[in-house]
Amino acid sequence: LSEAIYKCESVISKKNRWVKINNKKNSIEYEILPNFSNYNKYYNKYYSDYDKKIERIIKIIKDYSMDKAEMVATLYASWNDFIIKEEEISDIKIVKDVRENWNDTKKRFKENEWLDVLKEMKQVGLIPKGKGNLTIIKEQ
């Protein structure tokens, strides 16, 4: 898993004690703790304007496997970068970027798997708008 995920989990579970992380056999379960109301105040202050969009995304991906969620996030970021850079975009270019320019772990998924997930993203409306900063890909 991404280092960023571990950092986030550390903040919400160990530092702030908002959530307890229960590692299951094939999944991770997040248990809300009494201190969670403090997080809710933080969320409302910074993210309440995006609440409907966030809930929509959660509804779409909540039953995805970790691998599929990773693929969606990676494809979204790559696709968004193409939009920001105003480059010509195609499904093949996005998948090629992910498999060749991102972390080598992305190669564990076959090209057709990436293309299937990208197709599904379009069907459910997970389409980037070219907002934010370009993705910074760290050296391996």
Residue ranges and their predicted role:
Residues 1-140:
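Domain-edge interaction signal
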